[in-house]
Amino acid sequence: MSTIFNDTVEAAAENPDLEQPYAELGLKDDEYARIKEILGRRPTDAELTVYSVMWSEHCSYKSSKVHLRYFGETTTPEMAEKILAGIGENAGVVDIGDGNAVTFRVESHNHPSFVEPHQGAATGIGGIVRDIMAMGARPIAVMDQLRFGAMDNPDTQRVLPGVVSGISHYGNCLGLPNIGGETVFDDSYAGNPLVNALAVGTLKVDDLKLAFASGAGNKVMLFGSRTGLDGIGGVSVLGSASFEEGEERKLPAVQVGDPFAEKVLIECCLELYQAGVVVGIQDLGGGGLACATSELAAAGDGGMRVNLDAVPLRAEKMSAAEILASESQERMCAVVTPENVEKFKQICAKWDVTVAEIGEVTDEKDRYLVVHNGQTVIDAPASTIDEGPVYNRPVERPANQDEIQTLGGLERPDTAEGIRDAWFKLVSSPALCSRAFITEQYDRYVRGNTVQAKDANAGVLRIDEETNRGVAISADASGRYTRLDPRTGARLALAEAYRNVVSTGARPVAVTNCLNFGSPENAGVMWQFKEAVHGLADGAKEMGIPVSGGNVSFYNQTGDEPILPTPVVGVLGVLDDVEKTIGNRLPAGEQELYLLGETLDEFGGSIWQQVSGAGLSGLPPQIDLANEQRLADLLVPAADLVGAAHDLSEGGLGQTLAELAIHAGRGLDVDLTQVHEDLFTALFSESASRIVVATTRGDELVARAQELGVPVTRLGVTNDSGVITVRGGDLSVEVSVEELHDAWSNTLPEAFGHAVGANSVVE
């Protein structure tokens, strides 16, 4: 980043024609012209930096705003009734009753994780955790959604071990359980992996904190780690279409995290909240101090004056632009009344957290002033910095969309031997094999409140030890489905996350999302994006659960080739008593197995299509969200009817039966004749709205399912044979559970065994 160390507002007025490197900072010609129009002069170096940061896609949502508004338009008053903080805040906050609230959010750290996988992923965890802290909450868990290229791709071999070690190191050091996630391999993510991190926290309803600067004379306090040169340009460079290193210094655009500093910062924040000394608070993440202070000012009822000379630094002779744009981690910014400043400092000192008074709220509405070396380097309207431009970019259905929606030829084995071979091919594939190699590097049970995590439908946490109240969380996405039909793909992601939560017996209450797409300058990508947003928003409305917040990540592409459009959807559910959680492990003794839902011939975008080498074509499975709600109506009030439940998604019934048998080490004897007339279709179709349940009260289950209009089919029984026997029509297929387990569990260690992370317990 090119900087002029003493470029002041006065100097900018005196030197109006100075050439400035705005394009290197991600600004377009018309944006630079607009900034000069707003200021009535050329911007100072610091102003140019702040506008470039705040007008980046990451901070301003300038290409997505026009479409994201649809979430608000489709949210009814009834849906929003329990939302305490929603879209536009650091994280969504949901009132779950008894004076308790839960906050959750998912965010991307894609581009930094490609450049420096360990630190990129680690600071992704740190950043999303601070978003939770900024709502007044205690973080209690994290999850991740990961996408990589093919296993044997050199980039995947480099990036995956670093990403996993970064997530495990930061999360484990924080003492936060990692309660679930997804890892997907597809060629489209080679050169552009996706690292989406989700965090969840708890708070009392009355303890909610928001990001605004209110009350003239109130002080602006910066606390946490010192400000250095790491992360400069993170949102304006790494979050844009190109990566440019600075001319004078090759500043690192990837942040460096210290989880132990963040762990202390969490406790410090919680004590500050408890002491009642915080008026407003904002974390320092993407955009650093520039983003935090300008957002606080824009959201408040006055203006703000910031003194950069008071900012604690860990590098000498940093310019104003560098101080403002630094994305050094583990920092927070708070607004505090003058009488509480001393108490604020005392609490920070108790936790050995560096703190400085760096400014104050003024009575000059919307005026954002920044001083460095005693001179004014920024004098601008805060609202123009915060709001940014709004683009209604061209939207056009791709010319090849009809072609890709035509299902190509697909191999369909019709012999027992062929089906058996296909089954092994699927369970051992990169798409469906065991993720233990990754997940065993995460601590899933630290803090002692994890009820369900390993191989679970959804992560389940106890949040109140007195009442046993808890939450279930799942995050899901399918880029393959979304490429075939973006609207349906987003609805399927919502449906799967919803179904995973329901499978634990929890009642879904809110949705979050992270929308990962290619370049917004590509009309086809913007069509995908708009369709996905509408599919997700309409789906949430149909289900009556609000979208509480989200994140957008654009420019995910290699050259001109975008990734598969990947809308990650997270669903939060509430359990009145976690002791009644439905697990997904088969209990001991004979259990009857039932399939809830209907199986159709649906292989468009399926894993079998991918594994068999048939490419990507056809239409994704049909989805009627009313069917998902009927499943919820069946399972949530009557969790005691079933001993275990496992949703069906990728790999279909065959994958679910395999996982049930593998996890329990038990045999199954099932007849799929009533599921579908074709055994291969019965096993591997990926029809939505299906769950397998185990029960000893089959008659009651069937009666209740029929009463609610849920299709129900008896599959068979569990046993201790160590064999899965599947019949359908004239065919009978037998597979050894031990052999399935070996095929399922060896794929990842064989591909990445040379790069086991430092925190791994895998042998």
UniProtKB/Swiss-Prot annotation:
The name this protein carries in UniProt is Phosphoribosylformylglycinamidine synthase subunit PurL
Q: What class of enzyme is it?
A: ligase
For this protein, the record's NCBIfam families field holds: FGAM_synth_II (TIGR01736), PRK01213.1 (NF002290)
The record's subunit annotation is: Monomer. Part of the FGAM synthase complex composed of 1 PurL, 1 PurQ and 2 PurS subunits.
Question: Tell me, what does this protein do in biology?
Answer: Part of the phosphoribosylformylglycinamidine synthase complex involved in the purines biosynthetic pathway. Catalyzes the ATP-dependent conversion of formylglycinamide ribonucleotide (FGAR) and glutamine to yield formylglycinamidine ribonucleotide (FGAM) and glutamate. The FGAM synthase complex is composed of three subunits. PurQ produces an ammonia molecule by converting glutamine to glutamate. PurL transfers the ammonia molecule to FGAR to form FGAM in an ATP-dependent manner.
- Is Magnesium found in the keyword set? yes
Q: Catalytic positions?
A: 58, 109 (proton acceptor)
The Gene Ontology biological process terms listed for this entry are: 'de novo' IMP biosynthetic process
Origin species, per record, is: Corynebacterium efficiens (strain DSM 44549 / YS-314 / AJ 12310 / JCM 11189 / NBRC 100395)
- Which pathway is it part of? Purine metabolism; IMP biosynthesis via de novo pathway; 5-amino-1-(5-phospho-D-ribosyl)imidazole from N(2)-formyl-N(1)-(5-phospho-D-ribosyl)glycinamide: step 1/2
From the UniProt record, report the name of the gene that encodes this protein: purL
Q: Which UniProt keywords apply?
A: ATP-binding, Cytoplasm, Ligase, Magnesium, Metal-binding, Nucleotide-binding, Purine biosynthesis
The domain of life is Bacteria
GO molecular function terms noted in the UniProt entry: ATP binding; magnesium ion binding; phosphoribosylformylglycinamidine synthase activity
Q: Where ATP is bound, by residue? A: 61, 105, 513, 550
Q: Where does Mg(2+) 2 bind?
A: 131, 283
Family, per the entry? Belongs to the FGAMS family.
E.C. number(s) listed in UniProt: 6.3.5.3
List the InterPro entries.
Answer: PRibForGlyAmidine_synth_PurL, PurL_linker, PurM-like_C_dom, PurM-like_C_sf, PurM-like_N, PurM-like_N_sf
Question: For Mg(2+) 1, which residues are the binding ones?
Answer: 107, 551
